[in-house]
Amino acid sequence: MDRHHATYKKRLAAASKQEPADILVINGKLIDVYTLTIYEASIAITDGYIVGIGDYTEGKTVIDAQGKYVCPPLIDGHVHIESAMVRPEDFAGVLVPKGVLTAIADPHELANVAGVEAVTYMVEAAKDLPLDIKMAVPSSVPAASFEENGASLSAEDVRLLFANEGVYGLGEVMDYPAVLNGDDDMLEKIAMAKAKGRPIDGHAAGLNSDALNAYRTAGIHNDHEAVTAEEAKARVQRGFYVLMREGTAARDIEALLPAVTAANARRFAFATDDKHLDDLLKEGSVDFNVRKAIALGMDPLQAIQIGTLNAAECFQLDDKGAIAPGKEASFLFVSDLSTFQVDAVYAKGMLVAEKGELTSPIRTPYPVPERLLNSVHLAPFAREDLTLKLKNAHSTPVIETTLGSIVTKKAMASVPAENGIFQPGGKWLKLAVVERHEATGHIGLAIVKGFPFSEGAIAATVAHDSHNLIAVGADDESLYHAIHHVAGLGGGMAVVKGNNVLAAMPLKLGGLMSTDSAETVKQQLNELQQSLVHLGYQEKIDPFLTLAFLALPVIPALKLTSKGLFDVNAFAFVEQ
């Protein structure tokens, strides 16, 4: 008899009550996400799997739920760990106490810096953690063919990465023009995922009905870019799962909930996409999505189903998503469903977090490759290189941004200028994107409205998805010094006023992530936020994440790259 058969015989013996279970959970109120009901039952667990629910009475170890709700652990359907600015090990330490035990992660941020080496690092760093990180192979590196990033991933690279047992699916297909135009390299990546039966993640920002039809025909089966109820309905009608996103900059749940009905609710799941560490610590991960949906009027059982079973089925996670025989013995204890505060977290029958804290430390972090610690390479440039000369200052394209949104508007406006040279100040600030991977010296400049700074500048090497150095400022001196300081850090973020650095945070790992602990990163983020008041910034929303998306030329409408101002809807560069 092989070991596999012996394991199943042991589980079957416990399931049929011929032998005691390894673990017995008693006095719990089970949340049944299949029927959206609650009932009292014991849970029998053997070898880390649930073997029965009902009137079981024998277990070698007994866990008393003390009348609390027993809930399946949550699943984040789409996340970029890099946006939390900590390593996978530290990320797990933050999410597990929140009741999130599975995350579908796409490391395309770091892949845009260092390609295959970056993905391999993320896969290895994600192993043997209490958080089950399902790592996807990035499909669109770069996000658009004209981008200046640090690496690319070809179909052959994707093939090699799929051979790694730590790789789960194909990451979000951001380059939708490549799909719609039948690009051979992109179609080969999709075909590989299909052949392996792996999930294929979508990114259908702004696509009309015809484009959605083609996108779904290609085999892409979920999307997290719906921002209105109408967009969500259009996706569900075509067979997509809609991942309702609530991150730091993109907060879409309130707009999307009206699309959820009793008839279609099984086609919705939750995601965070991009969420800063301070927001994860303060609000939570997809546990916050659940709480927000409940606060907005959704039935708690429905919200829990969306955050568990729906996500598990969307991503073909057959052993997750419910408290039922054959599933992993992972579960949460929750006292009050209306507030959904997680009291305790069990992973495969083991207590891993209680009262918001881990019960044991996360293992030592995986070593970071040297290339990822040396990723910022700027060509020499002078302050004069930040001069923006306009063809017509009385009617020039301007990026209109709204804090809390990653979608911008294209506007034609009259802006302050002297001899045709833009003069930043007031509501009109200067945006700069400086190429930082190959020291090409390319600098994109634009005018942006919507950042409430009266002086100074902020800069960062977090600029989706090519992650060049991006900065916005009210004057060229501050802008110049902010860019140089961040480059000198080897990547990171800075708040600058004139030539004075008010606060800074190094992000040495690819210019995106810190090698410090989550607690240290939290403190540095707090210092950055506090320093913003000296620029006249009074808003609660973190401007750095809003800034980071101003360089992403696959989300409407007007964005800036190192090569210039780009109209996403027209998919073309525009003159200023």
Curated annotation (Swiss-Prot):
GO BP terms in the entry: adenine catabolic process
Name of this protein: Adenine deaminase 1
SUPFAM superfamilies, sorted: Composite domain of metallo-dependent hydrolases (SSF51338), Metallo-dependent hydrolases (SSF51556)
Transmembrane spans: none
PANTHER family the UniProt entry points to: ADENINE DEAMINASE, N-ACETYLGLUCOSAMINE-6-PHOSPHATE DEACETYLASE
InterPro entries: Adenine_deam, Adenine_deam_C, Amidohydro-rel, Metal-dep_hydrolase_composite, Metal_Hydrolase
Entry keyword annotation includes Membrane: no
Gene: ade1
Keywords: Hydrolase, Manganese
Organism: Shouchella clausii (strain KSM-K16) (Alkalihalobacillus clausii)
